[in-house]
Structures are given as C-alpha cells and as structure tokens.
Amino acid sequence: MRHVRTTLLMASQQLSSAVQWSTAQKAVQRLVPPLSFDSRKGQNGRIGVLGGSYEYTGAPYYAAQSALQAGADLAYVFCADGAAPAIKSYSPELIVLPCYKTANMNDQQATATAMQEVRPWLGRLDCCVIGPGLGRDEGVLQGVSSLMTAAEVRSICTIVDADGLFLVARDPELVEGRTDCVLTPNRRELERLAARLNVAAEADDVAAQVARKLGNVVVVAKGQRDVITDGTDVLVCDEPGAPKRCGGLGDVLCGALAPLAAQAARADAADAAFVGRRPLLWACYGACVASRRAAAAAFARKRRAMTAPDALAEIGGACESVAPTTVVEPPS
C-alpha cells in the first residue's frame, strides 16, 4: 500500500504518523476539477511562466508544456526577446511573449521594460511560475522583483524556482508571509536560503525552519526524498523516481504543480478531504508524486539516455495516475 509519511511539527516536538495513499490521493483529487462539455477555455488553469533568457530557453518551455500536460488550458511564457524565437519553435501550443531585452539596455531600462510588458497580463493568470531559465541580469531581476510584488497584490498564486530563488535569497521580503507562494529549491538553493535566514543548513528540519522564517510559505525541498513543508506540517514524498538526474526535471515539476497550486489557492481549507492540512501542501505532494512517476517511466524506457523531454512525455499519464480525470456527462 502506498503511503505518504507525514510529520506534524509542534514547538520542540516532532510527532509522526503514516497517512494511507488513499487519503493522500483523495486530498489531491479534490484539487482537480471535473471536466464538463460546457466548460470554457481557461477554466482549468491559465499559467504564466516568467523566465527564459538568451542562454536558457529549455527551462521555461519544460515548465509551460508540463503545465499543459498536467491539465492547464493555457500557458504563457514571458521571456527575453532573445529566447522567444527558440521557445516558439519548440511548441505551437505556448503563448510566447518577448517582454524584455538585456542587450544594449541599462538596468533601469530593462526593469522598466519587464514591468511594462508583463504587468498587463497578470490579471489573466491563475498561477505564475517565476525563475526557470531567468538568468541573473540585474535589470531583469529588479523587474521581476516588482512583478512578484504585483502578483502578491493581485493574489496570484506564485511558484518560485531556479534564479527566482536566487532573487528570494537576496530579498526574502518578496515572499514573506505569502500563503499562496511555493519555493522549490534543490539542495544548493536551500542552503543559500538557509544561510540568508541564519538557519543551519545541516539541521534535519532545515526546510521547515526556512518556511517558518519566511512566514510559513510552502517549501518543496527537492532531493532523494522531497520534503514539503509550511513550517508547521511536513509531507515527505519518497515515491521512487529515476537515478538519472538530468537538467530540466525541476522545471517539469514546477509546471505540473502550477494547475494544482492554482486550485489549492481557492480551495476550502476546511474540506474534510484535506485532513486539517493546507490544500497547497497536498498540491505540492501530488505534483511531486507525478513528476517522480514520470521520471521513473522515462528512465524505464530510455535508461541512461533519458533527458527532460522524456519525462515531459510521461507527465500527463503520471498526473492521471495520481488524480484520475472525472467527466460530467451532459444531460440526456
């Protein structure tokens, strides 16, 4: 029987219990709306990915395409102008918007351009993924900082990864106290956050301490096991993944998480299906399981030759295994 190990952190104590997979799946399933024949385009999620630079074009594509495979209706990519042609060529399904330049612009110009081009689109989004392939151009980072604040004002669920986490480590106030925000650090990124927040990186509960220091944002600490915590509750995902750790798998995870996170942000936390835990924690758990199953399936096919597109090809089926689609039949 599959299970997710769950830890409730209270003061100096740690209380552990096992939750059956059926309980976890029921919680995740509650975040996946049924499909109906009278639904409208966009009802199942409009996801924005803010990232992509001249050097890095694959990461935002993986995240946006994974969001579509996980059930979102629309995916936008807001990227540097030098990245847009490549990303457009990867998929005709993505809405790719070149929003800022880094060449021949000073930092102030790059910041202003990013703000002016992206801000009008924020109101269309249910969830924004910030960081895949973003790069560290100073003007762009300043623009993204302002956009993160604008997303908070509009209550847009936000997932921060990669260079977005570099930005958070530099300015933790960007996410402090945001209950609709998820950080998805790998080990090095978690260590950087811990150092910035004066948390011992070697502590067993480093992810939980980071989450608490940031005002109970949700942290998904990726590793051999994924630790999902808001500083109070902890879910540990030890679903088998793949021994091949290729670049891009974290982007696939962020994309798969986005539609679930958008639903979690407006879910009723009092719903009994969530067994007293925040819906956003269950959204992260479901995405972690799905991304690990996708990686395992890709590795089974390709073995050492496995790369991120192989996992991307499996993410739709993996999401279906976590939360099967239900369809509301039209009235006869």
Q: Whereabouts are the PLM-identified features?
A:
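Small-residue (G/A/S/T)-rich helix-start motifs and N-terminal tracts that mark the onset
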Residues: 1-159, 166-182, 187, 191-332
